[in-house]
Design a protein with these regions (language model features):
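Short linear recognition/processing motifs and adjacent strand/loop elements at protein termini
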Residues: 2-8, 15-113
Length: 113
């Protein structure tokens, strides 16, 4: 019985998705903005941008959004929104116009990844 219980606990920890949550939008001194999300662990991320309508799309695989996100912000960011379905979290950054942007990075902090 203990072996079965141990196996089920191990299996449930393996099945548990990587939880992701919105953290902050921060303006930098060099007229750029940084949008941060927190992850439990490192994930595969695919990102791309669209010109019309102007937006940046970030897909975080094997993840589950803690709660829906819809954050309005100042120029050039119109709205940051996110949702999850089937272990995929999609983050969409709606923009007033096309901007130069950098691919997302993952950094370890005290709060998570």
């Amino acid at each position: 019985m203990n072996k079965i219980l141990s196996f089920l606990l191990l299996l449930s920890s393996l099945v548990h998705s990587n939880e992701i949550s919105f953290y902050e939008i921060k303006d930098s001194d060099d007229q750029s903005s940084e949008i941060s999300f927190l992850l439990d662990k490192v994930s595969f991320i695919k990102s791309y941008s669209l010109v019309d309508p102007s937006r940046i799309v970030i897909d975080v695989y094997q993840s589950d959004l803690k709660s829906g996100v819809e954050e309005k912000y100042n120029y050039p960011i119109k709205l940051v929104r996110a949702s999850s379905k089937d272990d995929l979290t999609r983050i969409v950054i709606d923009l007033y116009e096309y901007v130069n942007w950098s691919k997302p990075t993952q950094e370890k902090t005290d709060e998570g990844i």
